[in-house]
Amino acid sequence: MKRRLLAAGCAMLLLSGCNAARQQPSPVPPVTQPQAYAEPEDTAANPGSLYSESDSEFLFSDNRARRVGDIVLVKVVETDKAKNKADTTADKTSTNELGVSAFFGQSSASINPINPAGPFSGAVGANPILGTSSTSKHSATGETKRESTVTTTIAARVLRVLPGGLMEVEGARETRVNDETQYIVVSGLVRARDVSSDNSVTSSQMANARIEYYGKGTLADKQKPGWFTRLMDNVWPF
């Protein structure tokens, strides 16, 4: 009796071990609240004065980005369309004939008077000894299309001010939704004169522009084949 109870208990332990453990979702990290700070007291303002300490640097200039560390808004409006089509057709026909009409000054009939129509009696255009012909044809058609559209606005920071009024700017944005992270990176050269009155510039006015838009996560992984498929594509010779 004790052996039966022991066997039944072992069986129950084994069956409970086969049950897959339920995966608990990872806890959401708590949101860190920003620390409050005391704002400095405002100096006594004169209602009848046009001067303000907060706007003192803009008395004789606007708020456009011109110095290192300034922020400029980059309006990315990119619509690219490309289409390429190629057709190739090639035909080649070749005909060769070989015959002997004379040999060391003797005609083919005098070489073999018994059988004037022997194997060496042929002439080009009449009865050639050897005749070959070949025909080659090649036809190919290729077409490629690509279209992309990116529209967004990114705040970029001035990294360097180059001679001639050029500013090197760079900005990035990271957006995370659930388990998917999207990255947008913009960098390039901007002329100070191209910065509009609202402190913005379009991506078409940037030189050496580099715009990257990519993501990491579940959706990005599903958009590409698996590692074994990519491996077979690289090593497959056919």
Curated annotation (Swiss-Prot):
Function noted in UniProt: Assembles around the rod to form the L-ring and probably protects the motor/basal body from shearing forces during rotation.
Highest taxon of source: Bacteria
Gene name as annotated: flgH
Record-stated family: Belongs to the FlgH family.
PANTHER family, per database record: FLAGELLAR L-RING PROTEIN
Record carries keyword Ion transport: no
Origin species: Nitratidesulfovibrio vulgaris (strain DSM 19637 / Miyazaki F) (Desulfovibrio vulgaris)
Location(s) in or outside the cell: Cell outer membrane; Bacterial flagellum basal body
One GO term of the biological process aspect: bacterial-type flagellum-dependent cell motility
Chain residue ranges for the region called Disordered: 22-50
Record's bilayer topology term: Lipid-anchor
Protein name from the UniProt record: Flagellar L-ring protein
Signal peptide: 1-17
Residue numbers with lipid attached (N-palmitoyl cysteine): 18
